[in-house]
Design a protein with these regions (language model features):
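Surface-exposed molecular-recognition determinants
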Residues: 1-354
């Protein structure tokens, strides 16, 4: 069996940097493969601006903000089109304002083509849902309308999701919730805050681990209020392309090594205690170690630079800091990571070191 099924991760995930001009412009990706994104996460690097998250299921201009509990908002001069190898944006603050530099993390699902699951007809799940899934890359975007009763929802992955990111879209404000398999089915993180990982959350996921076809939700306004709409971003691991795990910090400058099985393009790290969601990628550090530039997903702050945060290696991440946000002694951390290149290709060719 081949080590990986994805030799070119840029077909499914890319990080792109661009600068705003105050006018409508297209952003073209620079990876080996063209990537028409279905989920785009944009952040101004040099300005205090909200994170902007948009997807091709909910449609252009429909933004959610990772650092806020706000409902879905329509920004007419924000992201205005998903294109064959990138996207088009207007001149709005946080998207294309003059003098602002941006990073855009982009994932491919199914090109905007969705599947409607009629639960009563298919027998899959207890609640109707709409999903667009990319089973090769282990990513699906699911939308559904809450029932207010304990139920299950089809996700379309065909594999068990290790991570699900939930957000209520309408009616009233609610926290983002993150299910992470390493924390169990009665625990949740809040993407928009630095609160400690919430334990004993049986009222969210019904203390039930997702299956290869559905995830479970209980009667809770964060995930299942009657008649309100929700989006869930679901991820399952693909060897050599994505990994969702945990590690324990050692508190030393010669820090913990996290084996991923690939050279990372993006890693999002979160302590299970009170701390921020930290985002590191290979582009903002100019493609070289040490990776010393981070963005915080739960604040609107500009990116910051610290000495010797980590190295991106051919097979994982080596922490070079004793920072409490990534490597405090004895502290447990969760992470989500996607590849620039697999450690070994499907033909057995190893990647070169960074």
């Amino acid at each position: 069996m081949a080590y990986t099924t994805i030799d070119d991760p840029s077909a499914y995930f890319q990080t792109t940097l661009y600068s705003g001009t105050g006018s409508t412009a297209s952003v073209t990706n620079g990876g080996n493969s063209d990537l028409q994104p279905d989920w785009v996460w944009i952040k101004a690097r040099n300005a205090t601006r909200d994170h902007r998250l948009l997807d091709s299921t909910r449609g252009v201009q429909k933004e959610l903000v990772s650092n806020s509990d706000a409902v879905e908002y329509t920004e007419s001069t924000g992201l205005t089109a998903f294109q064959s190898d990138g996207f088009q944006h207007g001149g709005a603050n946080g998207y294309g304002a003059s003098g602002e530099n941006y990073v855009a993390w982009q994932w491919k699902a199914n090109g905007g083509t969705t599947t409607t699951n009629d639960a009563s007809s298919t027998g899959v799940g207890g609640l109707d849902s709409v999903y667009q899934a990319n089973t090769t890359a282990g990513f699906s975007i699911v939308t559904y309308t809450g029932s207010g009763s304990n139920t299950t929802v089809a996700h379309g992955l065909g594999n068990v999701p290790e991570v699900i990111i939930f957000k209520k879209r309408t009616d009233d404000t609610e926290d983002w919730l993150v299910y992470h398999h390493t924390q169990g089915n009665a625990s949740a993180g809040k993407l928009n805050t630095n609160d400690a990982w919430e334990t004993g959350s049986a009222s969210l996921f019904d203390s039930t681990t997702p299956t290869s076809s559905v995830f479970s939700i209980k009667t809770n306004s964060k995930v299942n209020d009657s008649s309100d709409t929700y989006v869930a971003y679901c991820f399952s691991e693909v060897q050599g392309y994505s990994k969702f795990g945990n590690y324990t910090g050692n508190g030393n400058a010669d820090g913990a090594f996290v084996y991923l099985g690939f050279k990372p393009a993006l890693i999002i790290v979160r302590a299970t205690d009170t701390d921020n969601w930290r985002m590191y990628d290979h582009k903002r550090a100019d493609g070289h170690n040490v990776i010393d530039v981070r963005i915080i997903a739960d604040t609107n702050a500009a990116e910051s630079q610290d000495d010797n945060e980590c190295d991106f290696l051919s097979n994982g991440v080596k922490w070079r800091s004793s920072s409490g946000g990534v490597n405090s002694d004895g502290q447990a951390y969760t992470y989500m990571a996607w590849a620039e290149h697999p450690f070994v290709s499907s033909k057995g060719v190893p990647v070169t070191a960074r």
